[in-house]
């Protein structure tokens, strides 16, 4: 969890809140395009995140967060495929200042241009786990499987080994039967989440939590 001030916590509880977004786009080639609140088309920005697909609690869910935004920008859309988008939320406090909170990192999946605007759709690092899994002879506890998945998909892990082993069934030995319907590393996370009695989402530093 990202640390915030007492003033921030108080402002969050108010009936009306004043906040704004800033961020930057970094292409795979390392070119950085910062943008500020005034660059964002009013009403265009959104972040959708969830931990279950219905009104009921579901164990083992592995949902990716989606972000969409439209910018007043002349940036060429073609170099933006797979580009990294870092968003920050700025909440206005009682004294009139703004406190910044960084969001998870998103990767651009769609970039479209109009005459004056750039439309982006992006997802967080959870989609990196949509990679074919071939470790069907793997045996270990939940931590071993999570560590394997994160290293294979180049994603950090928010919890320590001690954190995972302290969870329900965290020290149980797990294995994958040869006959299974696992296709991707995301499927592995799904089953590990069920064993632990939880779900997975991206934490503030784009690490599964």
List each model region and its residues.
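Juxtamembrane "anchor/assembly" segments of surface/extracellular structural proteins
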Residues: 1-80, 116, 123-129, 135-138, ...
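Hydrophobic beta-strand residues in large extracellular and virion-surface proteins
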Residues: 21-25, 67-71, 85-89, 106-108, ...
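Residue-level signal for glycine
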Residues: 29, 98-100
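Residues that flank catalytic or metal-binding motifs in active/ligand-binding sites
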Residues: 65, 104, 196
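Short coil-to-beta transition motif at edge beta-strands of beta-rich domains
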Residues: 77-95
